């Protein structure tokens, strides 16, 4: 009987820890690379995230890059990223489609879209 009581106490403790971790996990974070594999691209160039999620843009190669969101200056990162590994994060608080581009390389097709649900 005592073994059984100890088992249930341990299970209760484990389930409490798991529930705490489940609800304490921060919003999902995704990553988009700028200049992937030596190309003037965002990789991926299309991404779907949830409201409250963050996306980190990482300068991979071929600087300089920036990220400008059409109609959303508050999300844009106008400063040019020159160093490989340089990054910045954008958090999306409203659902919608967010088109973005690298201004220096938009003519080369360096554009993308983030769908926020």
What are these regions (language model features)?
Residues 25-117:
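Extracytoplasmic copper-binding redox domains, predominantly the cupredoxin/blue-copper superfamily
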Residues 15-24:
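Bacterial N-terminal signal peptides
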Residues 3-15:
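Bacterial N-terminal signal peptides that target proteins for export
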């Amino acid at each position: 009987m005592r073994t059984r009581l100890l088992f249930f106490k341990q299970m209760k403790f484990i389930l409490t820890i798991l529930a705490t971790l489940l609800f304490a996990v921060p919003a999902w974070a995704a990553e988009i690379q700028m200049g992937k594999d030596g190309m003037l691209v965002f990789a991926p160039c299309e991404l779907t995230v949830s409201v409250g999620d963050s996306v980190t843009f990482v300068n991979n190669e071929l600087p300089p890059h920036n990220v400008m969101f059409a109609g959303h200056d508050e999300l844009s990162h106008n400063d040019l990223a020159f160093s490989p590994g340089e990054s910045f994060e954008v958090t999306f608080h409203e659902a919608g489609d967010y088109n973005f581009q690298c201004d220096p390389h938009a003519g080369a097709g360096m554009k993308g879209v983030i769908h926020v649900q």
